[in-house]
Protein backbone atom coordinates (compact mmCIF):
# COMPACT_ATOMS: atom_id res chain seq x y z
CA UNK A 1 0.00 0.00 0.00
CA UNK A 2 1.41 3.39 -0.97
CA UNK A 3 1.96 5.69 1.98
CA UNK A 4 0.19 9.04 1.77
CA UNK A 5 2.68 11.87 1.56
CA UNK A 6 2.38 14.40 4.36
CA UNK A 7 2.42 18.06 3.42
CA UNK A 8 5.49 19.41 5.16
CA UNK A 9 4.24 22.97 5.43
CA UNK A 10 4.15 22.84 9.23
CA UNK A 11 7.08 22.10 11.53
CA UNK A 12 7.22 18.44 12.61
CA UNK A 13 7.50 17.23 16.23
CA UNK A 14 7.74 13.69 17.64
CA UNK A 15 5.80 13.14 20.83
CA UNK A 16 4.60 10.27 23.00
CA UNK A 17 2.31 9.43 25.90
CA UNK A 18 4.01 8.04 29.02
CA UNK A 19 2.73 7.09 32.49
CA UNK A 20 1.46 4.26 34.69
CA UNK A 21 -0.54 1.32 33.34
CA UNK A 22 -4.31 2.02 33.11
CA UNK A 23 -3.98 5.75 33.79
CA UNK A 24 -5.41 6.42 30.32
CA UNK A 25 -2.50 6.89 27.89
CA UNK A 26 -4.17 5.04 25.01
CA UNK A 27 -7.60 6.61 25.67
CA UNK A 28 -5.97 10.03 25.62
CA UNK A 29 -4.17 9.24 22.34
CA UNK A 30 -7.52 8.19 20.80
CA UNK A 31 -9.22 11.31 22.21
CA UNK A 32 -6.59 13.63 20.69
CA UNK A 33 -7.12 12.16 17.19
CA UNK A 34 -10.89 12.36 17.63
CA UNK A 35 -11.08 15.94 18.92
CA UNK A 36 -8.53 17.33 16.42
CA UNK A 37 -10.11 15.21 13.66
CA UNK A 38 -13.41 17.07 14.09
CA UNK A 39 -11.83 20.28 12.80
CA UNK A 40 -9.47 18.68 10.28
CA UNK A 41 -10.71 15.97 7.94
CA UNK A 42 -7.13 14.98 7.00
CA UNK A 43 -6.50 13.56 10.47
CA UNK A 44 -7.20 9.84 10.71
CA UNK A 45 -9.31 9.27 13.81
CA UNK A 46 -8.00 6.20 15.65
CA UNK A 47 -10.18 4.21 18.02
CA UNK A 48 -8.84 2.83 21.30
CA UNK A 49 -8.76 -0.76 19.98
CA UNK A 50 -6.79 0.22 16.88
CA UNK A 51 -4.12 1.90 19.01
CA UNK A 52 -4.09 -0.81 21.66
CA UNK A 53 -3.47 -3.58 19.10
CA UNK A 54 -0.06 -2.11 18.32
CA UNK A 55 2.02 -4.12 15.86
CA UNK A 56 5.30 -5.62 17.02
CA UNK A 57 8.44 -4.11 15.57
CA UNK A 58 12.05 -5.12 15.82
CA UNK A 59 14.64 -2.51 16.70
CA UNK A 60 18.25 -3.70 17.14
CA UNK A 61 16.95 -7.25 17.68
CA UNK A 62 14.50 -6.22 20.39
CA UNK A 63 10.79 -6.82 19.98
CA UNK A 64 8.76 -3.72 20.77
CA UNK A 65 5.06 -3.03 20.35
CA UNK A 66 4.43 0.58 19.45
CA UNK A 67 1.40 2.36 18.03
CA UNK A 68 2.07 5.35 15.79
CA UNK A 69 -0.60 7.96 15.13
CA UNK A 70 -0.30 11.33 13.44
CA UNK A 71 -2.27 14.50 13.79
CA UNK A 72 -1.84 18.22 13.44
CA UNK A 73 -2.70 21.39 15.29
CA UNK A 74 -2.91 24.83 13.67
CA UNK A 75 0.82 25.33 14.07
CA UNK A 76 2.44 21.87 13.96
CA UNK A 77 2.37 18.33 12.61
CA UNK A 78 2.84 15.59 15.22
CA UNK A 79 3.91 11.95 15.08
CA UNK A 80 2.72 10.38 18.34
CA UNK A 81 3.81 7.05 19.85
CA UNK A 82 1.86 5.05 22.40
CA UNK A 83 3.00 1.70 23.80
CA UNK A 84 0.65 -0.98 25.15
CA UNK A 85 2.91 -2.39 27.88
CA UNK A 86 5.35 -1.00 30.42
CA UNK A 87 8.22 -3.13 29.06
CA UNK A 88 7.58 -1.65 25.61
CA UNK A 89 8.10 1.87 26.98
CA UNK A 90 11.37 0.91 28.62
CA UNK A 91 12.68 -0.68 25.41
CA UNK A 92 11.34 2.12 23.25
CA UNK A 93 12.93 4.93 25.20
CA UNK A 94 16.29 3.21 25.61
CA UNK A 95 16.69 2.07 22.00
CA UNK A 96 15.31 5.34 20.66
CA UNK A 97 13.07 3.27 18.39
CA UNK A 98 10.65 6.15 18.60
CA UNK A 99 12.57 9.36 19.22
CA UNK A 100 10.65 11.77 21.45
CA UNK A 101 11.08 15.54 21.25
CA UNK A 102 8.67 15.81 24.16
CA UNK A 103 6.21 13.74 26.16
CA UNK A 104 2.70 13.89 27.58
CA UNK A 105 2.77 12.37 31.05
CA UNK A 106 -0.64 10.91 31.87
CA UNK A 107 -1.55 10.66 35.57
CA UNK A 108 -4.89 9.41 36.85
CA UNK A 109 -6.37 12.00 39.22
CA UNK A 110 -8.09 9.13 41.05
CA UNK A 111 -4.79 7.34 41.84
CA UNK A 112 -2.07 9.96 41.75
CA UNK A 113 1.53 9.14 40.79
CA UNK A 114 2.33 5.39 40.81
CA UNK A 115 5.58 3.38 40.45
CA UNK A 116 5.63 3.47 36.63
CA UNK A 117 4.88 7.21 36.70
CA UNK A 118 8.18 7.58 38.55
CA UNK A 119 10.03 5.16 36.30
CA UNK A 120 8.86 6.86 33.10
CA UNK A 121 9.86 10.31 34.41
CA UNK A 122 13.31 8.95 35.34
CA UNK A 123 13.68 7.23 31.96
CA UNK A 124 12.66 10.41 30.15
CA UNK A 125 15.37 12.27 32.07
CA UNK A 126 18.02 9.59 31.43
CA UNK A 127 17.40 9.34 27.69
CA UNK A 128 17.20 13.11 27.26
CA UNK A 129 13.52 13.87 26.55
CA UNK A 130 13.78 17.67 26.83
CA UNK A 131 10.31 18.66 28.06
CA UNK A 132 6.98 17.21 29.10
CA UNK A 133 3.43 18.33 29.70
CA UNK A 134 1.10 16.62 32.20
CA UNK A 135 -2.47 15.49 31.55
CA UNK A 136 -4.30 14.85 34.83
CA UNK A 137 -6.81 12.31 33.59
CA UNK A 138 -10.08 10.91 35.03
CA UNK A 139 -10.93 14.15 36.87
CA UNK A 140 -14.61 13.21 36.39
CA UNK A 141 -14.04 10.47 39.00
CA UNK A 142 -12.83 12.91 41.67
CA UNK A 143 -15.45 15.02 43.47
CA UNK A 144 -13.15 16.76 45.92
CA UNK A 145 -11.27 19.75 44.42
CA UNK A 146 -8.76 19.64 47.32
CA UNK A 147 -7.81 16.12 46.28
CA UNK A 148 -7.06 17.33 42.75
CA UNK A 149 -4.83 20.07 44.18
CA UNK A 150 -3.03 17.45 46.26
CA UNK A 151 -2.42 15.13 43.30
CA UNK A 152 -1.17 18.05 41.22
CA UNK A 153 1.27 19.06 43.98
CA UNK A 154 2.48 15.47 44.23
CA UNK A 155 3.11 15.31 40.46
CA UNK A 156 5.01 18.63 40.52
CA UNK A 157 7.20 17.44 43.41
CA UNK A 158 7.95 14.19 41.60
CA UNK A 159 8.93 16.03 38.41
CA UNK A 160 11.24 18.36 40.37
CA UNK A 161 12.84 15.37 42.11
CA UNK A 162 13.99 14.11 38.70
CA UNK A 163 15.26 17.54 37.60
CA UNK A 164 12.31 18.57 35.45
CA UNK A 165 11.01 22.09 36.24
CA UNK A 166 8.03 20.89 38.31
CA UNK A 167 6.86 24.43 39.10
CA UNK A 168 6.53 25.54 35.49
CA UNK A 169 5.35 22.39 33.68
CA UNK A 170 1.79 22.85 32.38
CA UNK A 171 -0.69 20.47 34.05
CA UNK A 172 -4.01 20.14 32.22
CA UNK A 173 -6.99 18.58 33.99
CA UNK A 174 -9.49 16.59 31.99
CA UNK A 175 -11.07 13.28 31.13
CA UNK A 176 -10.11 11.36 27.99
CA UNK A 177 -13.30 9.34 28.37
CA UNK A 178 -15.50 12.47 28.38
CA UNK A 179 -13.68 13.66 25.26
CA UNK A 180 -14.29 10.31 23.54
CA UNK A 181 -17.98 10.59 24.51
CA UNK A 182 -18.07 13.99 22.81
CA UNK A 183 -18.82 15.98 25.98
CA UNK A 184 -17.87 19.67 25.62
CA UNK A 185 -15.81 19.82 28.84
CA UNK A 186 -13.90 16.71 27.72
CA UNK A 187 -13.11 18.22 24.32
CA UNK A 188 -12.16 21.58 25.84
CA UNK A 189 -9.47 19.86 27.97
CA UNK A 190 -7.97 18.18 24.87
CA UNK A 191 -7.74 21.56 23.11
CA UNK A 192 -6.09 23.03 26.23
CA UNK A 193 -3.63 20.12 26.32
CA UNK A 194 -2.66 20.55 22.66
CA UNK A 195 -2.23 24.32 23.13
CA UNK A 196 0.16 23.55 26.00
CA UNK A 197 2.05 20.99 23.88
CA UNK A 198 2.28 23.50 21.00
CA UNK A 199 3.72 26.22 23.20
CA UNK A 200 5.74 24.30 25.82
CA UNK A 201 7.39 21.46 23.87
CA UNK A 202 10.30 23.07 21.98
CA UNK A 203 10.77 22.81 18.23
CA UNK A 204 13.53 20.19 17.72
CA UNK A 205 16.79 21.27 16.08
CA UNK A 206 16.94 19.70 12.63
CA UNK A 207 19.83 17.30 12.00
CA UNK A 208 21.27 19.57 9.31
CA UNK A 209 21.51 22.46 11.80
CA UNK A 210 23.56 20.53 14.37
CA UNK A 211 27.39 20.52 14.32
CA UNK A 212 28.93 18.30 11.63
CA UNK A 213 29.40 14.64 12.62
CA UNK A 214 30.21 11.59 10.49
CA UNK A 215 31.03 8.14 11.90
CA UNK A 216 33.92 6.69 9.88
CA UNK A 217 33.03 3.39 8.23
CA UNK A 218 36.02 2.88 5.96
CA UNK A 219 39.39 4.41 5.08
CA UNK A 220 41.15 4.38 1.70
CA UNK A 221 44.36 5.75 0.33
CA UNK A 222 44.20 7.30 -3.14
CA UNK A 223 47.65 7.71 -4.63
CA UNK A 224 48.51 11.31 -5.36
CA UNK A 225 45.41 12.59 -3.55
CA UNK A 226 45.64 11.39 0.02
CA UNK A 227 43.37 9.65 2.49
CA UNK A 228 39.63 9.27 1.98
CA UNK A 229 37.20 8.34 4.78
CA UNK A 230 33.69 7.15 3.97
CA UNK A 231 30.47 7.08 5.95
CA UNK A 232 27.00 8.53 6.31
CA UNK A 233 26.86 12.07 7.65
CA UNK A 234 24.85 11.87 10.88
CA UNK A 235 24.46 15.58 11.58
CA UNK A 236 25.29 18.98 10.19
CA UNK A 237 27.08 19.93 6.98
CA UNK A 238 30.69 19.94 5.79
CA UNK A 239 32.13 22.14 3.03
CA UNK A 240 35.35 21.75 1.06
CA UNK A 241 38.07 23.79 2.76
CA UNK A 242 36.65 23.46 6.29
CA UNK A 243 38.65 22.17 9.24
CA UNK A 244 37.54 18.86 10.78
CA UNK A 245 38.60 16.81 13.78
CA UNK A 246 39.13 13.04 13.89
CA UNK A 247 37.87 11.98 17.32
CA UNK A 248 37.92 8.74 19.31
CA UNK A 249 40.13 5.69 19.98
CA UNK A 250 43.39 7.67 19.51
CA UNK A 251 44.43 11.23 20.30
CA UNK A 252 42.26 13.79 18.47
CA UNK A 253 43.74 14.96 15.15
CA UNK A 254 42.86 17.99 13.05
CA UNK A 255 42.70 18.08 9.27
CA UNK A 256 41.04 19.92 6.39
CA UNK A 257 38.34 18.53 4.13
CA UNK A 258 39.79 18.93 0.62
CA UNK A 259 37.03 17.11 -1.23
CA UNK A 260 33.54 15.62 -0.84
CA UNK A 261 32.48 12.84 -3.17
CA UNK A 262 29.08 11.18 -3.52
CA UNK A 263 28.13 8.56 -6.13
CA UNK A 264 31.51 9.22 -7.83
CA UNK A 265 30.68 12.90 -8.27
CA UNK A 266 32.60 15.74 -6.65
CA UNK A 267 30.54 18.08 -4.48
CA UNK A 268 31.22 21.36 -2.70
CA UNK A 269 29.62 20.08 0.49
CA UNK A 270 27.81 17.18 2.15
CA UNK A 271 24.97 17.24 4.69
CA UNK A 272 23.12 15.01 7.18
CA UNK A 273 21.85 11.85 5.49
CA UNK A 274 24.43 11.82 2.66
CA UNK A 275 26.69 8.80 2.13
CA UNK A 276 30.00 10.39 1.20
CA UNK A 277 33.72 10.02 0.83
CA UNK A 278 35.72 12.86 2.38
CA UNK A 279 39.27 13.61 1.33
CA UNK A 280 41.51 14.65 4.24
CA UNK A 281 44.65 16.78 3.89
CA UNK A 282 47.91 15.59 5.46
CA UNK A 283 46.51 12.51 7.18
CA UNK A 284 48.14 9.08 6.88
CA UNK A 285 45.98 6.10 6.00
CA UNK A 286 47.24 4.41 9.20
CA UNK A 287 46.24 7.35 11.41
CA UNK A 288 42.50 6.84 10.86
CA UNK A 289 40.25 3.85 11.54
CA UNK A 290 36.65 2.69 11.58
CA UNK A 291 34.97 3.65 14.86
CA UNK A 292 36.38 7.16 14.94
CA UNK A 293 34.23 10.12 13.91
CA UNK A 294 34.86 13.13 11.75
CA UNK A 295 33.45 16.22 13.47
CA UNK A 296 33.33 19.99 13.56
CA UNK A 297 36.32 21.06 15.71
CA UNK A 298 35.43 21.34 19.41
CA UNK A 299 31.92 19.93 19.01
CA UNK A 300 32.49 16.45 20.50
CA UNK A 301 35.10 14.94 22.82
CA UNK A 302 36.36 11.39 23.44
CA UNK A 303 35.46 9.63 26.71
CA UNK A 304 36.12 6.19 28.15
CA UNK A 305 33.84 6.38 31.19
CA UNK A 306 30.10 6.99 31.26
CA UNK A 307 26.86 6.20 33.02
CA UNK A 308 24.21 4.37 31.01
CA UNK A 309 20.56 3.41 31.06
CA UNK A 310 20.37 -0.12 29.63
CA UNK A 311 17.76 -2.69 28.65
CA UNK A 312 19.05 -6.28 28.84
CA UNK A 313 17.47 -8.62 26.30
CA UNK A 314 15.39 -11.50 27.63
CA UNK A 315 16.21 -15.10 26.76
CA UNK A 316 13.24 -15.13 24.33
CA UNK A 317 14.69 -12.15 22.48
CA UNK A 318 17.93 -14.05 21.95
CA UNK A 319 19.67 -12.49 24.93
CA UNK A 320 21.58 -14.11 27.78
CA UNK A 321 20.06 -17.02 29.69
CA UNK A 322 21.76 -16.01 32.94
CA UNK A 323 22.16 -12.73 34.84
CA UNK A 324 25.42 -10.77 34.84
CA UNK A 325 27.19 -9.32 37.86
CA UNK A 326 29.67 -6.54 38.63
CA UNK A 327 32.81 -6.36 36.42
CA UNK A 328 31.05 -8.09 33.51
CA UNK A 329 33.14 -7.38 30.36
CA UNK A 330 31.17 -7.42 27.11
CA UNK A 331 31.65 -5.46 23.87
CA UNK A 332 29.96 -2.07 23.49
CA UNK A 333 28.97 -1.30 19.91
CA UNK A 334 29.01 2.46 19.20
CA UNK A 335 28.00 3.68 15.72
CA UNK A 336 30.39 1.54 13.64
CA UNK A 337 32.61 -0.40 16.04
CA UNK A 338 32.89 -2.64 19.10
CA UNK A 339 34.90 -1.54 22.16
CA UNK A 340 35.44 -3.75 25.20
CA UNK A 341 34.28 -2.27 28.50
CA UNK A 342 33.79 -3.21 32.14
CA UNK A 343 30.49 -2.70 33.93
CA UNK A 344 30.27 -1.28 37.45
CA UNK A 345 26.87 -1.92 39.04
CA UNK A 346 25.44 0.40 41.73
CA UNK A 347 26.23 -0.69 45.30
CA UNK A 348 22.66 -1.86 45.93
CA UNK A 349 22.51 -4.07 42.83
CA UNK A 350 24.07 -7.54 42.92
CA UNK A 351 23.13 -8.62 39.40
CA UNK A 352 21.11 -7.74 36.32
CA UNK A 353 18.63 -10.29 34.99
CA UNK A 354 17.76 -10.85 31.31
CA UNK A 355 14.65 -8.72 30.56
CA UNK A 356 15.60 -6.08 33.17
CA UNK A 357 16.51 -2.46 32.71
CA UNK A 358 19.30 -1.00 34.82
CA UNK A 359 21.53 2.02 35.35
CA UNK A 360 25.27 1.41 35.65
CA UNK A 361 28.73 2.79 34.89
CA UNK A 362 30.97 1.59 32.09
CA UNK A 363 34.76 1.91 31.67
CA UNK A 364 35.92 1.36 28.08
CA UNK A 365 39.43 0.20 27.09
CA UNK A 366 39.65 3.05 24.54
CA UNK A 367 37.81 6.37 24.34
CA UNK A 368 34.89 6.97 21.97
CA UNK A 369 33.46 10.30 20.74
CA UNK A 370 30.32 10.62 22.84
CA UNK A 371 27.73 12.88 24.41
CA UNK A 372 24.55 12.33 26.41
CA UNK A 373 21.93 10.53 24.35
CA UNK A 374 24.34 8.38 22.30
CA UNK A 375 22.86 4.93 21.68
CA UNK A 376 24.84 1.69 21.81
CA UNK A 377 24.38 -2.08 21.82
CA UNK A 378 25.97 -4.54 24.22
CA UNK A 379 27.33 -7.58 22.43
CA UNK A 380 28.81 -10.88 23.46
CA UNK A 381 30.39 -13.18 20.90
CA UNK A 382 28.76 -11.23 18.07
CA UNK A 383 25.18 -11.38 19.35
CA UNK A 384 23.31 -8.47 20.90
CA UNK A 385 22.54 -8.95 24.60
CA UNK A 386 21.49 -5.41 25.48
CA UNK A 387 20.73 -1.90 24.26
CA UNK A 388 21.63 1.29 26.02
CA UNK A 389 21.92 5.04 25.96
CA UNK A 390 24.62 7.26 27.50
CA UNK A 391 22.86 9.16 30.29
CA UNK A 392 25.97 10.95 31.60
CA UNK A 393 29.56 11.34 30.44
CA UNK A 394 31.96 10.93 33.37
CA UNK A 395 35.43 12.01 32.28
From Swiss-Prot:
<dbReference type="GO" id="GO:0005737">
    <property type="term" value="C:cytoplasm"/>
</dbReference>
<dbReference type="InterPro" id="IPR009001">
    <property type="entry name" value="Transl_elong_EF1A/Init_IF2_C"/>
</dbReference>
<dbReference type="InterPro" id="IPR004541">
    <property type="entry name" value="Transl_elong_EFTu/EF1A_bac/org"/>
</dbReference>
<dbReference type="InterPro" id="IPR000795">
    <property type="entry name" value="T_Tr_GTP-bd_dom"/>
</dbReference>
<feature type="binding site">
    <location>
        <begin position="19"/>
        <end position="26"/>
    </location>
    <ligand>
        <name>GTP</name>
    </ligand>
</feature>
<dbReference type="InterPro" id="IPR005225">
    <property type="entry name" value="Small_GTP-bd"/>
</dbReference>
<dbReference type="GO" id="GO:0003924">
    <property type="term" value="F:GTPase activity"/>
</dbReference>
<feature type="binding site">
    <location>
        <begin position="82"/>
        <end position="86"/>
    </location>
    <ligand>
        <name>GTP</name>
    </ligand>
</feature>
<keyword id="KW-0479">Metal-binding</keyword>
<dbReference type="InterPro" id="IPR027417">
    <property type="entry name" value="P-loop_NTPase"/>
</dbReference>
<comment type="function">
    <text>GTP hydrolase that promotes the GTP-dependent binding of aminoacyl-tRNA to the A-site of ribosomes during protein biosynthesis.</text>
</comment>
<comment type="similarity">
    <text>Belongs to the TRAFAC class translation factor GTPase superfamily. Classic translation factor GTPase family. EF-Tu/EF-1A subfamily.</text>
</comment>
<dbReference type="InterPro" id="IPR009000">
    <property type="entry name" value="Transl_B-barrel_sf"/>
</dbReference>
<feature type="region of interest" description="G2">
    <location>
        <begin position="61"/>
        <end position="65"/>
    </location>
</feature>
<protein>
    <recommendedName>
        <fullName>Elongation factor Tu</fullName>
        <ecNumber>3.6.5.3</ecNumber>
    </recommendedName>
</protein>
<keyword id="KW-0251">Elongation factor</keyword>
<feature type="region of interest" description="G4">
    <location>
        <begin position="137"/>
        <end position="140"/>
    </location>
</feature>
<feature type="binding site">
    <location>
        <position position="26"/>
    </location>
    <ligand>
        <name>Mg(2+)</name>
    </ligand>
</feature>
<keyword id="KW-0342">GTP-binding</keyword>
<keyword id="KW-0378">Hydrolase</keyword>
<feature type="region of interest" description="G3">
    <location>
        <begin position="82"/>
        <end position="85"/>
    </location>
</feature>
<feature type="domain" description="tr-type G">
    <location>
        <begin position="10"/>
        <end position="205"/>
    </location>
</feature>
<dbReference type="Pfam" id="PF03144">
    <property type="entry name" value="GTP_EFTU_D2"/>
</dbReference>
<keyword id="KW-0648">Protein biosynthesis</keyword>
<dbReference type="GO" id="GO:0003746">
    <property type="term" value="F:translation elongation factor activity"/>
</dbReference>
<dbReference type="GO" id="GO:0097216">
    <property type="term" value="F:guanosine tetraphosphate binding"/>
</dbReference>
<dbReference type="InterPro" id="IPR050055">
    <property type="entry name" value="EF-Tu_GTPase"/>
</dbReference>
<feature type="region of interest" description="G1">
    <location>
        <begin position="19"/>
        <end position="26"/>
    </location>
</feature>
<keyword id="KW-0963">Cytoplasm</keyword>
<keyword id="KW-0460">Magnesium</keyword>
<feature type="binding site">
    <location>
        <begin position="137"/>
        <end position="140"/>
    </location>
    <ligand>
        <name>GTP</name>
    </ligand>
</feature>
<dbReference type="GO" id="GO:0005525">
    <property type="term" value="F:GTP binding"/>
</dbReference>
<feature type="region of interest" description="G5">
    <location>
        <begin position="175"/>
        <end position="177"/>
    </location>
</feature>
<dbReference type="InterPro" id="IPR031157">
    <property type="entry name" value="G_TR_CS"/>
</dbReference>
<dbReference type="InterPro" id="IPR033720">
    <property type="entry name" value="EFTU_2"/>
</dbReference>
<dbReference type="InterPro" id="IPR004161">
    <property type="entry name" value="EFTu-like_2"/>
</dbReference>
<keyword id="KW-0547">Nucleotide-binding</keyword>
<comment type="subunit">
    <text>Monomer.</text>
</comment>
<dbReference type="InterPro" id="IPR041709">
    <property type="entry name" value="EF-Tu_GTP-bd"/>
</dbReference>
<dbReference type="Pfam" id="PF03143">
    <property type="entry name" value="GTP_EFTU_D3"/>
</dbReference>
<dbReference type="Pfam" id="PF00009">
    <property type="entry name" value="GTP_EFTU"/>
</dbReference>
<dbReference type="InterPro" id="IPR004160">
    <property type="entry name" value="Transl_elong_EFTu/EF1A_C"/>
</dbReference>
